[in-house]
Curated annotation (Swiss-Prot):
Keyword list, A-Z: Methylation, Ribonucleoprotein, Ribosomal protein, RNA-binding, rRNA-binding, tRNA-binding
GO cellular component: small ribosomal subunit
Transmembrane segments: none
Feature: compositional bias, Low complexity: 116-137
Protein name as it appears in the record: Small ribosomal subunit protein uS12
Residue numbers of 3-methylthioaspartic acid PTMs: 89
NCBIfam families reported for this sequence: rpsL_bact
HAMAP family: Ribosomal_uS12_B
Gene name, Swiss-Prot/TrEMBL: rpsL
Coiled coil: none
GO biological process assignments: translation
Assembly and oligomerization: Part of the 30S ribosomal subunit. Contacts proteins S8 and S17. May interact with IF1 in the 30S initiation complex.
Region (Disordered): 101-137
Amino acid sequence: MPTIQQLIRLGRSVKVSKTASPALEKCPQKRGVCTRVYTTTPKKPNSALRKVARVRLSNKVEVTAYIPGEGHNLQEHSIVLIRGGRVKDLPGVRYHIVRGSLDTSGVADRKQSRSKYGAKQPKAGAPAAPVKGKGKK
């Protein structure tokens, strides 16, 4: 507990909060150009080939961003939109690429959670394909 004299001399120090996505510079999203698109493996105990891209943002910062969903059309020089959001089992990946915006296509044949993957609503006349995991066994 500080004395009154110590408070007069030094004052209270304000806690500085650290942002989880510093490259966005307080913006909700940022545009960037893919410099490298590749796959990487997650930390233990998980096992997969996660799709990621190295992106050079409009503010000249280079970050690693995750490509969500099944299949993608990204390659070098593709223009993408990134948002914050880390991938827990990929160290150093603190951003997500927004599907369905700029050069990134939406996920094909996506029926549920479509807005998160940039998928358009299926046509009303088209026959509904059976959804995996749903139905009788």
